Amino acid sequence: MKILQILAHPDYDNKNRISNLLAELGEEELRKKYNNITTLNLYDPKCYIPVMDKHMFNYDDKELTKQEEADKTRQEELLNILKKSDCVFIYMPLHNFNVVSKFKDFIDNIVIVNETFKCEIETMVGLDNTNKQVTFVITSGGEFDSHIQYVNLDFAVQYVRGVFSVIGIDKVKIIRSQGLDLVHNDKQAIVENTKEELIKHINSL
């Protein structure tokens, strides 16, 4: 089985961040069963993700500059990494009620017409492997699936489910480590419960 791990914490090399801590645990557990794991740490300067601009819309319409050629090649690399993976694990903190910007940049490079989806009359059809599973591990200070103030702001989960559905992937497992900043909560207990849930999920693959 080929695994793609996507780490999406802006503080990308801080192992004390809960998102990074869970990603490290997840990889340790996955390596007990699988050795074909590709990791993209989106905020690491060594992990280049092309940014959406006017040139990205015109790759096929003109002679490309060296930078545009490099961006197109990188986009093709990212597409191939995704297409060849059997499972995708995403580790991300919630930021301003939505996904972080580098993850959106990644999505802009893989959600491409006639590559991962096609347009038909009044609908879109995903072209990726429908048996592929995405696991979205999201950390947050608030409680977004239960708190009355936040349930209608749970955009990140809706976005991840929706965008992967567009490309044909409906198997999306959500693992939340939430309420981490609420004073009445036991943060360490929340993290430990999330670890247990993550390990159990990985063992079920």
Please provide the spans of the model-predicted regions.
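A structural motif corresponding to the C-terminal end of an alpha-helix
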Residues: 29-30, 81-86, 132, 163-172
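Active-site donor-binding loop signature of nucleotide-sugar glycosyltransferases
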Residues: 42, 139, 177-179
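N-terminal beta1-alpha1-beta2 submodule of the flavodoxin-like/Rossmannoid cofactor-binding fold
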Residues: 1-105, 112, 196-205
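Conserved short hydrophobic patches within well-ordered secondary structure
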Residues: 22-26, 138, 164
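Flexible, glycine-rich phosphate/dinucleotide-binding loops
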Residues: 12-13, 46, 143, 181-183
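Helix-loop-strand module that forms the ligand-binding subsite of alpha/beta enzymes
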Residues: 69-153, 157-158
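Glycine-rich phosphate/pyrophosphate-binding loop and the adjoining helix
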Residues: 27, 146-205
